Amino acid sequence: MFRSITQRVIRNNCYKQSTKSITSSTSFINNSLSYTTTSNENDIKDKNEEHDHRAKGKGRELLLSFDKSGLAQFPKQVFKNRKYPITDFEKYLQDITKVRGPMSIDTFIKEVLTNPKYGYYMNKDVFGKGGDFITAPEVSQLFGEMIGIWCVATWEAMGKPKKLQIVEMGPGRGTLMKDILRSTKVFKEFYDSISVHLVEASPANKKTQKQNLLYFKDKAINFDHKTIGETPNGIKVTWVGKLEEVPTDIPTLFLAQEFFDALPIHVFRFSREKNDWCEVLVDEDITEHGEYYLRFVQSKGPTLMTTAVKHLLPEFGLDGYQVELGLAGLAISQQIANRIDKSGGAALIIDYGYDKIVKSSLQAIRDHEFVDILDKPGTADLSVWVDFQTIRKTVKLLKNKSTAIGPVDQGIFLKEMGIEHRLAQIGRKLDSNEKFEELVMGYKKLVDPKEMGTNYKVITICDKNITPIGFSTSKTYDDEDLMI
């Protein structure tokens, strides 16, 4: 399900700066303007000399002459093997590297996914059959209904607080929240206690979410950098751009379904020559044989980031050993844990990933197919496989009232939440075999180990005094050694 990062090293710097003393002379003759720039050398007819004649009307001529022999020459064969003409976004990314030098993969992912003008998520609906990929809520209503059951059961385990926030991070098209609100309205006491916050950066996604969730689709109001609306059943929905804008003094259930996989990462590679960790970066590619306009390179030595996270990296010296570290995801995990410690609640993180540190999983998907990461950036989704082990250990490092439990396979979690019972319940009410077969197909895709059942995993962050719902099969981890 993933493709390794293409490793391209060695940068050819063709932008060496050299200057040569240039003098200029100007002369005005008979209403004719002639501007001439020459070198100190007498022979301005050298083969490196260029002339640009531009008519400015009868009797007017602009003459430019300059010697380029002292300037660095751009390779004549550059870009000749490229698969397509360079895009405006690629020019923009190249300009960044020219000014600042190679960028971290963290910065590259941020630009590709959330750049206001070119970002993949910012200007179109990318979910569902008409988009580039399908997420679990789009597969079947059963998924959202099981998450709704988890919300109600966890609220009860918390002691049924009178006020409860449900916060979804990266809510996609709003399908998951729509199914949760539809399926839980039979639990009146729970329903009367809830409000919803959606953490969304994409204007295009926010528009789709409003259409799916609100009673008055175009009547949501903007207040204090937030957008506020109401569902047909009277549930208040607030859109914010980041988690920090969500109130911290109310018990909260946090939902992150395929959210962490889209967060930026840093990639580190051990160099035996340097006997230290280096960082994998993205640079412009101006070589003759490169397929794309960007390429991956390795830093010449430790960077500021490798120094900052060195205590998190393994201490062994296999040359070329590579590690992905999602610092943004770890920071959000700790932020959620601190909120739960302060005000109570729980979090459910669902994503594809491993219960171990990840080496090389960055991937790009366009039109439901994997493509090269550097192929027309901004037109394909970038994602990584989530490192659940590091999330769990990072939360436990806080040593407060919160803890992390899991992960468990998605298929096992959904079965423990009662998906099979719900499948049978709905199946008895369907009036055609086609509808029943469609329902069963969705169920199988969610729980089958060959589909999403095993690759997708679930982890919870919760108060230590709460017995987490859906995690009875979770392993007991010896995390005394919290070294990642």
From Swiss-Prot:
Places the protein is found: Mitochondrion
EC number of this enzyme: 2.1.1.320
Reported consequences of knocking out the gene: Cells show pleiotropic defects. Cell size, growth rate, phagocytosis and macropinocytosis are affected. During development, cells show an enhanced tendency to remain at the slug stage, and spore viability are compromised.
GO molecular function, one term: protein-arginine omega-N symmetric methyltransferase activity
Matching SUPFAM superfamilies: S-adenosyl-L-methionine-dependent methyltransferases
Alphabetized InterPro entries for the sequence: NDUFAF7, NDUFAF7_sf, SAM-dependent_MTases_sf
Chain segment of the transit peptide: 1-12
Reactions this protein catalyses: L-arginyl-[protein] + 2 S-adenosyl-L-methionine = N(omega),N(omega)'-dimethyl-L-arginyl-[protein] + 2 S-adenosyl-L-homocysteine + 2 H(+)
UniProt enzyme class: transferase
GO cellular component: mitochondrion
Main location: mitochondrion
Source domain of life: Eukaryota
Keywords per UniProt: Methyltransferase, Mitochondrion, Transferase, Transit peptide
A Gene Ontology biological process term: phototaxis
Main function: Involved in the assembly or stability of mitochondrial NADH:ubiquinone oxidoreductase complex (complex I). Acts as an arginine methyltransferase and probably acts by mediating arginine methylation of ndufs2.
Complex and partners: Homodimer. Interacts with ndufs2.
Similarity-based family: Belongs to the NDUFAF7 family.
Protein name: Protein arginine methyltransferase NDUFAF7 homolog, mitochondrial
